[in-house]
Amino acid sequence: MTIFSHFQNRYETTRQEEYSLQEYLDLCKQDRSAYATAAERLLMAIGEPELVDTTSNSRLSRIFSNKVIRRYPAFAEFHGMEECIDQIVAYFRHAAQGLEEKKQILYLLGPVGGGKSSLAEKLKHLMENVPFYAIKGSPVFESPLGLFNAAEDGTILEEDFGIPQRYLSSIMSPWAAKRLIEFGGDISQFRVVKLYPSILNQIAIAKTEPGDENNQDISALVGKVDIRKLEEYPQNDADAYSYSGALCRANQGLMEFVEMFKAPIKVLHPLLTATQEGNYNSTEGLGSIPFMGILLAHSNESEWHSFRNNKNNEAFIDRIYIVKVPYCLRVSDEIKIYEKLLTNSSLANAHCAPDTLKMLAQFSVLSRLKEPENSNVYSKMRVYDGENLKDTDPKAKSLQEYRDSAGVDEGMNGLSTRFAFKILSKVFNFDPHEIAANPVHLLYVLEQQIEQEQFPAEVRERYLRFLKEYLAPRYIEFIGKEIQTAYLESYSEYGQNIFDRYVLYADFWIQDQEYRDPETGEILNRMALNEELEKIEKPAGISNPKDFRNEIVNFVLRARSNNNGKNPTWLSYEKLRVVIEKKMFSNTEDLLPVISFNAKASKEDQQKHNDFITRMVERGYTEKQVRLLSEWYLRVRKSQ
């Protein structure tokens, strides 16, 4: 299929289909979606959720307290927003059931760059997927059911066509009322069309924004007289009116009001009757115009607070259904957001060194969290991400304790994802010769940006503390392990020798026997054996050597029976592997011959160095990054 035929097919599927009123009513009998409300159609577009039993995943079970959670595939790209999306879907579900929510404005409240606009755009795109039925030619896309009177016609429509009476709450528009007079009351002359909502053509989807307080009026919402038609029609004639307002265009669909509370209050008045009564007045002496759609608004907290604190706005506030859209507070989900943004940019295939996105996500999340009492904020961040800190930080509290003490506004302040992505852009372009990102450049760019942003002194100090107290030290540890792991593979034989010698000495020490070295003939008594064992144990801080030695020897004896009497590899027992690594890297000088980029003393050293670079590249670094990060690590270790 060519692109042209593909486009043509897509266009054909959304073309109008025309019916007589009788055919439409017969269709209602067979298909409930023919008279579905906007909320019902949006629920259809969202689809059924996937139920996730968090008890089967230790991380999720800690985050969601072992509950079964709902995840909607339609919102798969919105990471870490399960609670917010659940509330939005609940609003549509209740509105679809005809409850109070159908008379309320869905209001997304959150900080800048938190995802409000993205959610609004997603809802508008979802709305485009499900068609609706309207009277042909109606400038406000009104439902054919608006032609009927619930009190007079409701019983007949329910008995003959199965249409519940609650769907007959709409009124006829002034345009339809004029046509009815022209048809002499013969409603069968009305034609019905099947339409797909369209953002592009403003069919059942509209967007309005606040304008200048001095010149914006309600015509942006309700339309106005078309001056060009006044030659043909009187000013109060339905055909002289331009139904161009957002409420007119969004009937039976969704109207988005961007930064709603920045608009003058007089502009918002039509929304009161549109939500509560399902209709609103025009700017002229016409009859009321129907509105059976969804009102979606969003703005930042500052506008909401000033609006709420004004007593004159109480009637309006009562008609608002608030859904908070805070910043993401889980590091793993914040990383997914960055990955999504990178995928949609030309940096999708650029090199990003391991831990770069994680470090930026940690910094962003730390800026959004409230500092806990009697516990550090870094531990709180890890608990929020579902980590178990029982063994590593005994002062860490449970996730629920942290949430309770933080209050309901956590996540409504801090650095936005937008800010973080701008930082990431600078990091990728930091090196003039290579489009790539790494944590060392990230630390530098973050520090520079914090100085330039002119944050309040307290906030600035707090952000710098995050870098120096939490992120930099942990990255030194991380890159150290990366380098050591790549280095270690050059010295696997050395590691095995230490392992074998440790097991041998520990075995003789436990049995309280002297050990004679078969090569040198040197005899080691129990005290000498203990000294040799401690040389390996002390760098790792082993607090109970006796138990540790017994544990290791028992493990090796069991392993030998399954390995033809040979010792297992030194990597096979985690506890001893860590001890040996600490022993091997207790002196930075041991690393220098392999990881430094100075001239090598021998071909053997050069080969090991080349092997080290190859292994680092395999781990996700560019050759240039290997050099930069290795030299940075050696400098830092030396200064410590």
Positions of predicted regions on the chain:
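N-terminal accessory segments that target, anchor, or regulate ATP-driven/P-loop NTPase machines
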Residues: 1-52, 113
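Conserved ASCE/P-loop NTPase catalytic core
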Residues: 33-640
